[in-house]
A protein has these predicted regions:
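Glycine-rich phosphate/diphosphate-binding loop of Rossmann-like nucleotide-binding domains
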Residues: 202-314
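Glycine/serine-rich phosphate-binding loop and adjoining beta1-alpha1 elements at the start
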Residues: 96, 115-230
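Flexible, glycine/charged-enriched surface loops at secondary-structure junctions
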Residues: 20-23, 39-46, 119, 156-165, ...
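Rossmann-like adenosine-cofactor binding region
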Residues: 265-367, 372
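Structured beta-strand/loop patches that form or line metal/cofactor-binding pockets in enzymes
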Residues: 42-71
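Adenosine-phosphate binding glycine-rich loop
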Residues: 2-25, 221-222, 336-449
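General beta-strand structural signal in soluble alpha/beta enzymes
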Residues: 106, 160-164, 188-192, 259-262, ...
Length: 449
């Protein structure tokens, strides 16, 4: 392994030893960059990797709000502005109890390369809070969002930092956040947030974009293997917005999703989530606040496996769509034993490094990384920014056509970067190399800043 890369990883481990998620993503990305680092000794002279792994700015703040009982609650808010070399900081806001600085830094670091892969001018950032919206009333969520934005508004803007939604932050939350921003700033800057409602500057296809984009990327992988999506059975986790997008597009293209999963377990539907009634019910489940996938089993009379993950279920394709590190060695071994050929990461870093590298070594198994696969969400966010800047609204067909093109190019650029480095069809390394190159070129051109 390259000595410079090892030195930077060691420094990160020593300085950020309490941030396991961040260390994990830094190790995975930097180790895959060896071919490019070897070719460019000027990167070490410029301290490029040291600068790359250090956020430009970390903002941490308290978020006080009043609950339904009139009691004051205090949560912690974050915004990690990781890298602005190729554009304003861009990345979602996550409201979930597991949110901490390590998670925010890992997501912001990944976002930097993901945004670069889209070819759109967006830097990397991420934010959120340890506030859990599950079980909260609309009024409580509104008060929290207003308090959160009262501080965040100091640090964002259409040409500075453009947040969006993520886990726990959907259209309702974006609306509350935008309303508070507009109230405080006294200006209608609809480019300050993406994922907005269509009535105030949002884009068609945005809710579906991450799931749709993941399936479009999958289709490019299948095409490379002289295969097709038609008739394929797909196992996924989650049942939220991303999973719904995957189910919808898979059905449209002739495949079927046979599992959904939540905190309570998973369901197996041999007929697939392949009717409009089932897809509509996924939206009902997501908006109910119950967070139970068993509701699907009860309604449609399919099998429910309490407390289990879906990865023991035989499928042609596995697409984890839930949380980071949901796939460990135990799950990876089940996926391999079932003869799954295509492992397509959709959630951010859903696989531990050990499990990821183990699956990548399996003969005939194709592994695709989340930073490429799930880039459709931020790609359409970028297209929303473009529409806001031009004061235009594109049709769903226009947005979808651009999304297809972006996902095709991400696959093509990743494939070519891996081939150029002599790594064959290694989509994991290829995505890291392709995303890194653009950011590195910009950082080198802009001096030591």
């Amino acid at each position: 392994m390259n000595a410079y890369i090892e030195e930077v990883i060691a420094k990160v481990k020593a300085r950020d030893s309490h941030e396991p998620e961040f260390i994990q993503t830094v190790e995975e990305v930097l180790r895959s960059l060896e071919p490019m680092i070897e070719k460019h000794p000027e990167y070490q002279e410029a301290g490029l990797l040291e600068r790359l792994v250090e956020p430009e700015r970390v903002i941490e703040f308290r978020v006080p709000w009043v609950d339904r009982e009139g009691k004051v609650q205090v949560n912690r808010g974050f915004r990690v502005q990781f890298n602005s070399a190729i554009g304003p900081y861009k990345g979602g806001l996550r409201f979930a109890s597991h949110v901490n600085l390590s998670v925010m830094k890992f997501l912001g670091f990944e976002q930097t390369f993901k945004n670069s892969l889209t070819s759109l001018p967006m830097g990397g950032g991420k934010g959120g809070s340890d506030f859990d919206p599950n079980g909260k009333t609309d009024a409580e969520i509104m008060r929290f969002c207003q308090s959160f934005m009262t501080e965040l508004q100091r640090h964002i803007g259409p040409n500075v930092d453009v947040p969006a939604g993520d886990i726990g932050v959907g259209g309702r939350e974006i609306g509350f956040l935008f309303g508070q921003y507009k109230k405080i700033r006294g200006a209608y800057e609809n480019g300050v947030l993406t994922g907005k409602g269509l009535s105030f500057g949002g884009s068609l296809i945005r809710p579906e974009a991450t799931g749709f984009g993941a399936v479009y990327y999958l289709c490019e992988v299948l095409k490379h293997e002289n295969d097709t999506i038609e008739g394929k059975e797909i196992a996924i986790s989650g049942f939220g917005n991303v999973s719904w997008g995957v189910c919808t597009k898979a059905m449209q293209l002739g495949a079927k999703v046979i599992t959904l999963a939540g905190p309570d377990g998973y369901i197996y539907d041999p007929d697939g989530v392949c009717t409009q009634e089932k897809l509509d019910y996924m939206l009902v489940m997501r908006n109910s606040g119950r967070n139970k996938v068993q509701d699907y089993a009860d309604k449609f009379g399919v099998q429910f496996f309490p407390g289990q993950k879906p990865w023991g279920q035989k499928a042609d394709i596995c697409m984890p769509c839930a949380y980071q590190n949901e796939i460990r060695m135990e799950e990876a071994e089940k996926i391999i034993a079932n003869g799954t050929k295509y492992y397509i990461e959709v959630a951010n870093m859903p696989t531990t490094n050990e499990a990821l590298f183990h699956m990548m070594k399996q003969p005939g198994m194709i592994v695709a990384p989340s930073k490429a696969v799930n880039a459709g969400g931020v790609a359409v966010s970028g297209l929303e920014m473009s529409q806001n800047s031009e004061r235009l609204a594109w049709s769903a067909e226009e947005v979808d056509e651009k999304l297809v093109t972006i996902m095709k190019n991400i696959h093509k650029n990743s494939m070519e970067a891996a081939a150029e480095a002599g790594l064959g069809y290694n989509l994991v390394a290829g995505a890291n190399l392709a995303g890194f190159k653009k950011v590195a070129d910009a950082m080198m051109a802009q001096g030591i800043v």
